[in-house]
Amino acid sequence: MQMDNRLPPKKVPGFCSFRYGLSFLVHCCNVIITAQRACLNLTMVVMVNSTDPHGLPNTSTKKLLDNIKNPMYNWSPDIQGIILSSTSYGVIIIQVPVGYFSGIYSTKKMIGFALCLSSVLSLLIPPAAGIGVAWVVVCRAVQGAAQGIVATAQFEIYVKWAPPLERGRLTSMSTSGFLLGPFIVLLVTGVICESLGWPMVFYIFGACGCAVCLLWFVLFYDDPKDHPCISISEKEYITSSLVQQVSSSRQSLPIKAILKSLPVWAISTGSFTFFWSHNIMTLYTPMFINSMLHVNIKENGFLSSLPYLFAWICGNLAGQLSDFFLTRNILSVIAVRKLFTAAGFLLPAIFGVCLPYLSSTFYSIVIFLILAGATGSFCLGGVFINGLDIAPRYFGFIKACSTLTGMIGGLIASTLTGLILKQDPESAWFKTFILMAAINVTGLIFYLIVATAEIQDWAKEKQHTRL
């Protein structure tokens, strides 16, 4: 904790400061791209000219079928699956390249242009659907790549903008936007479809994205030293706190050292574990509610949105508490990271395993479902920002690699869960949550043993070797 003692004793503003304002701006970017990605999942119900027996049929949908504001398309379930998954391909392909280039090129330009592209493509989805399926797939794939740029490149921001004792708060504030976006989509998409037609969903979220993009180019700067509006005291506070970590010199990426680093593998394993449980809770919560509670579609949508809201709250709480423990010297950095990672892995496992045994009580199922889906966001104060501790110079690349590993875990989890539900419906939920708990515990054990918060040798400045 020697680095903490180097921080300037002069107290600077917190939530009224520019660094927190920029973190909130990134939060808005994340809300937008998540909303643009998730809205098609719901609008697909009223875009197709057939009713999926496992989907969302109801009387309001029948009314929408007769509304000229909602064009209908004869897309088979297979075509719908291709369209819905096309975004993921773009995100996966772009991860590692963005992680590399975000440490070289301007983060402001990368995120700004990517957000603009994603928003413009959102505006083009309705006309693309009228032209043909191929155009929708292309738009969604490119949009996924653009959203992947925003989601990955943003972590490079905190290398120069986040003081060590404020990393938890700043990163959790911004990344919690990924959780608030789906909550907003679940609340407003149905209303927009009923009143204005499904194309307006894409137009509204696309227009909001363009507006946020303009704010981004005006307000954000890659380095606090270059920002014309930041106060001198805040600028000195940030630069002084990061003087031991941030350097303007650019060294080649030590790929071999990164691949051999056990702390990096601990972070990647943690990401794999998090996305495994997160994807299960995200994709299968509506199905679980339908099978256990037998509610109508409107109630299902409302109940499905609650875990996102509480996850947003838990994520921000994790950031506040993690920095509180560090600021008061209650715990070391690695103790804080392991504590919140343990909470983010164990609590969803415990609440998830209890869910299949609560079939007779409505409120207990809802409460445990919310807790199982929300408490995983405690990882925002743990493994999610651990890469910034061990290798701030290469945080963007490490975050990209760990996110890619996590997305693979999420893909395996969603596919395997689908097979379990199909082959053994009676005990499927028990098997699903037991497997999720086993993955969470295994991933946590590995992380607790291997993880560290010390800057790795391969991530340190090597300027003396050039003299």
Curated annotation (Swiss-Prot):
Glycans are attached at N41, N49, N58. Belongs to the major facilitator superfamily. Sodium/anion cotransporter family. Interacts with PDZK1. The chain crosses the membrane at residues 81-101, 119-139, 178-198, 200-220, 257-277, 301-321, 339-359, 365-385, 401-421, 433-453. The keyword Transmembrane applies. It catalyses: 3 Na(+)(out) + phosphate(out) = 3 Na(+)(in) + phosphate(in); urate(out) = urate(in). InterPro entries: MFS, MFS_dom, MFS_Na/Anion_cotransporter, MFS_trans_sf, Pi_cotranspt. It is found in: Apical cell membrane. Expressed in kidney cortex, liver and brain but not in other tissues. It is a multi-pass membrane protein. It comes from Homo sapiens. Its main location: membrane. This is Sodium-dependent phosphate transport protein 1.
